Amino acid sequence: MANEFRVCDDCKAPNLKTLLPRLKKLDPDAVIKIGCQSYCGPGRKKTFAFVNNRPVAALTEDELIDKIAERLKSR
């Protein structure tokens, strides 16, 4: 089963221009869905993505990518 990344295009923390290519690099076969994730509170303060329906958040995009990579390895 392919991994799924879900990111918000409404929240201020995630920068989709830089985040999306990095997610594709982590898993080129993953499904990426863009839209409101109803995660507004944390999404204003931290960059985040949902990985296979689980939220992953970090203060920086680099930390987020590291956390997502770990999540994918443990799967």
From Swiss-Prot:
Q: Name one Pfam family in it.
A: DUF1450
Q: Where is the signal peptide?
A: none
Report the domain of life of the source organism: Bacteria
Q: Which HAMAP family match?
A: UPF0741
Family to which the UniProt record says this protein belongs: Belongs to the UPF0741 family.
Name of the protein in question: UPF0741 protein GTNG_3358
Organism of this sequence: Geobacillus thermodenitrificans (strain NG80-2)
Show the taxonomic lineage.
Answer: Bacteria, Bacillati, Bacillota, Bacilli, Bacillales
